[in-house]
């Protein structure tokens, strides 16, 4: 029978899963190998952590290892490759980690303090545009003490630094296989994570096999995972129904989720696991473009866009309108864009443009990625185009590109207006503001605001109680609303669709909404 599971009921579901059969596999072994096939529309743009600040993390979390990470059920970083980590001073400016003993990479190299330093320094040395180097702004230097101890010296207080180290971008790599000055692009991985990457065919498949030398917190409930990458979510759903894949992650459209839930008779043997998402979608305005650089144009768009209609028509209850760059459920969330711009108001938008001397329809090109966020992205932008042109104030041209080319384009400043999605690096308001401001934001379009970068963010990072930073982030959102360099659209939900014989889906998403493949297993009857 078809059923829908909520992560809020994960404890009960986990118990039911254990009762479902005797074939649950753990790292202690089982009589038969467990192999799982997972489908997704989100293929990696790179296999090198030094270049990854995107959905490539989904694969990296499973084949690399970080010093600290998020065990299932935890929202605070805990040791993984490290035996222990802690701040050694009251100002949160020195973070010391001691490694587990006898760690090694898949090529046999020793994973010691020097390898850790090499991995982190390499991110800064390569300085890949749009990559994770922007996350290391508070890092001054990395010091090794013997083979098993590494100390991160910060240039300012940063209580979020352990969260940063827990991201797949900070994955540890084997120095012998990764150059200090160049991104690795041979389609291979040399890590120390839960799985080995046996083979990889870009945009098609990744074959993972349990790493026999892994030493970390992941209790692997399967022996091998095949990840299939689909360009269209419809093909992915068809493969699920045909038992060609066991589960899907990332890319289901709203229509597909609703169809799977409503047509129970046609979808017997399938289940949906729903997670409250912290992922957001927003527009980015590039100041290199004359129209996008005009504050009046940006504010007029903010007055015209109808989020309720967008969510209702395109996402059908699988998302909700977002009026802040910080989503619901995260400390510091406000409704600042609604408070300022209110409900859609074409007359107000026209007045703003007229006062700025704009009397003709504004011609603009909106760009979006065709494959990163699922098949609904195209109809989403068609709906935005419809709304803006219906106002009589805009003439919109739409352009779509596959993620890799799209990423190159926005990093080179080629797109005047483009859509981005953001899946949090970690569940903290800092991660919904800091990545988008400064000289090297993840959007590729420099957005310098000294009050945010030099006052508000530094003040918030001195506070170890992350629930007590709302004041700074409320002010930051006021600035974002006034500038309208970023326009939040909606906040999503995450869904895993799987065969009814697949367990672990309710535990497979970490706080970064990254799929932990090791949680999936095939149930067996008694």
Question: Which stretches of residues belong to each language-model region?
Answer:
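N-terminal lobe/hinge region of extracytoplasmic solute-binding protein
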Residues: 39-90, 121, 190
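Extracellular/periplasmic solute-recognition and catalytic clefts
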Residues: 141-143, 198-209, 226-289, 312
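Surface-exposed binding/hinge segments that line
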Residues: 96-98, 133-177, 199
């Amino acid at each position: 029978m078809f059923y829908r599971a909520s992560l809020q009921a994960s404890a009960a579901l986990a118990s039911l899963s254990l009762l479902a059969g005797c074939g649950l596999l753990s790292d202690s072994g089982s009589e038969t190998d467990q192999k799982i096939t997972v489908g997704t529309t989100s293929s990696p743009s790179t296999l090198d952590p030094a270049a990854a600040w995107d959905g490539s993390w989904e694969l990296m979390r499973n084949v690399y290892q970080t010093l600290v990470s998020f065990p299932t059920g935890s929202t605070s970083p805990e040791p993984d490759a490290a035996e222990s980590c802690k701040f050694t001073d009251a100002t949160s400016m020195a973070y010391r980690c001691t490694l587990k003993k006898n760690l090694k990479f898949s090529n046999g190299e020793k994973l010691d303090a020097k390898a850790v330093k090499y991995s982190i320094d390499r991110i800064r040395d390569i300085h890949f545009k749009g990559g994770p180097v922007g996350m290391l702004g508070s890092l001054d230097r990395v010091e090794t003490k013997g083979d098993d101890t590494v100390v991160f010296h910060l240039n300012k207080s940063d209580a979020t630094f352990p969260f940063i180290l827990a991201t797949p971008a900070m994955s540890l790599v084997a120095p012998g296989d990764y150059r200090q000055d160049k991104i690795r692009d041979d389609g291979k991985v040399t890590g120390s994570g839960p799985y080995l990457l046996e083979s990889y065919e870009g945009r098609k498949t990744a074959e993972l096999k349990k790493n026999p030398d892994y030493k970390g917190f992941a209790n692997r409930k399967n022996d091998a995972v095949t990840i299939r990458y689909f360009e269209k979510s419809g093909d992915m759903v068809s493969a699920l129904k045909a038992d060609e894949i066991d589960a899907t992650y990332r890319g289901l459209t709203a229509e597909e989720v609703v169809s799977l839930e409503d047509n129970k008779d046609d979808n017997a043997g399938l289940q949906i696991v729903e997670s409250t998402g912290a992922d957001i979608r927003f527009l980015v305005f590039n100041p290199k473009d004359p129209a996008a650089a005009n504050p009046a144009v940006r504010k007029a768009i903010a007055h015209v866009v109808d989020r309720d209609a967008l969510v209702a028509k395109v996402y059908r209850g699988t998302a909700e309108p977002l009026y802040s760059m910080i989503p619901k459920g995260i400390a510091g969330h406000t409704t600042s864009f609604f408070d300022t711009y209110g409900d859609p108001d074409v007359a107000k938008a026209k007045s703003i443009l007229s006062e700025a001397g704009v009397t003709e329809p504004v011609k603009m090109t909106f760009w979006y990625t065709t494959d990163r966020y699922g098949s609904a992205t195209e109809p989403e932008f068609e709906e935005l185009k419809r709304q803006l042109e219906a106002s009589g104030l805009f003439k919109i041209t739409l352009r779509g590109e596959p993620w890799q080319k799209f990423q190159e384009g926005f990093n080179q400043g080629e797109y005047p207006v483009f859509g981005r999605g953001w899946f949090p690096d970690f569940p903290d308001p800092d991660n919904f503001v800091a990545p988008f401001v400064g000289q090297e934001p993840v959007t590729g379009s420099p957005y310098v605001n000294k009050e945010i970068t030099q006052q508000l963010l530094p003040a918030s990072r001195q506070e170890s109680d992350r629930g007590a930073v709302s004041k700074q982030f409320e002010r930051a959102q006021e600035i974002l609303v006034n500038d309208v360099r970023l326009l939040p659209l909606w906040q999503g939900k995450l869904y895993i669709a799987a065969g009814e014989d697949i367990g672990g889906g309710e535990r497979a998403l970490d706080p970064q909404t990254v799929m932990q493949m090791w949680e999936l297993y095939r149930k067996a009857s008694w």
